[in-house]
Amino acid sequence: MASPGKPGADEAQEEEGELEGGSAGPRAAILEQAEELFLLCDKEAKGFITKHDLQGLQSDLPLTPEQLEAVFESLDRAHTGFLTAREFCLGLGMFVGVASAQGANPCRTPEETFESGGLDVQGTAGSLDEEEEEEERFHTVLEQLGVAPVLGKQRAVRTLWARLQRERPELLGSFEDVLIRASACLEEAARERDGLEQALRRRESEHEREVRALYEETEQLREQSRRPPSQNFARGERRSRLELELQSREQDLERAGLRQRELEQQLHAQAAEHLEAQAQNSQLWRAHEALRTQLEGAQEQIRRLESEARGRQEQTQRDVVAVSRNMQKEKVSLLRQLELLRELNTRLRDDRDACEARRAGSSCRKALTTARLPGPTCCCCCCWARPPRRGSGHLPSAR
């Protein structure tokens, strides 16, 4: 499988036969001039030039746009709409009588001169093998997707696929989806076109049969017109009717042709709308993927926050339980201390009452001793009785 823009074996042999007598000096000069022209045209370093790029040299070359267009068409043998460095140099070599050999001549190819400036024929063979492998991979992908019959010969699709594979491999999936949808739309449009063409062919065949029948009837009328005049009147009327019918059928055929052109225009418009819808669907799909990614991130953040909230709630519950247990323990401890204080208070009161009772007994004994001594008598015995203490809750015992 040859790469795009590569001349065939017969063309290479013809070029070698025509240019075999050229010297190395003119060949190198022409190749340098071809390199300069190609680089002037390929300002964006795409690796290929189009008709518009070549027409950009109008200010540098004494040629009209029509002449430049004719030169481009003569160089574009494959009719791909673009020229690679190899095609451009080989074409100029054909015009000026200089071309690079592909067999035993160890000179550089124009494409190698542009890209590296110093590679040998072995490097060129390696690049061609890589290009053939890339072409085979591209056709394998198209066959796997089922779109090879529709898009297998589209060079623009192959160029875009190769560029995405090199620069943006993550977009190959989306590009393949777009190819599948575009192929489906093109197949549907092709089926509609085939249906319209078949209907038109059937209509044309029917019309041809009708016209042929009308012509045969006209010929019969002409033959009958040569008969005696007594029979010509009715036959003339019939002939007039047939001619009118023939004109009507021809008008119907013209209207059918107009209808076909209208349907073809509608078909092209629908195909353009399908492509635009596919592009919009691709954009919407990318927007949907972005929103889905954002939604997943938000959901993940919500789950993380909920997990943190549950952890905090569980920690709070554990803290509350711990505080409740501590308070219960402190309550029990305080109740025990209160009970101990009550017991201590009771013992202290009992001790105080016992002390007061002992004091009261000693006071009574002192009073009796004093009463036995001579002195004034007193009828009141409360002089030795101690008044009750406030707040004691006990009365002194009288003895």
Curated annotation (Swiss-Prot):
The keyword Secreted does not apply. Gene3D superfamilies: EF-hand. GO terms for biological process: store-operated calcium entry. One of its GO terms (molecular function) is calcium ion binding. Residues 33-61, 67-95 form the EF-hand domain. Residues 216-226 have a biased composition (Basic and acidic residues). It comes from the Eukaryota. InterPro entries: Ca-binding_regulatory, EF-hand-dom_pair, EF_hand_dom. Residues 1-25, 216-239 are annotated as: Disordered. Keywords: Coiled coil, Phosphoprotein, Repeat. Residues 181-358 form a coiled coil. The modification Phosphoserine is found at residue 3. Belongs to the EFCAB4 family. Plays a role in store-operated Ca(2+) entry (SOCE). This is EF-hand calcium-binding domain-containing protein 4A. The lineage of its organism: Eukaryota, Metazoa, Chordata, Craniata, Vertebrata.
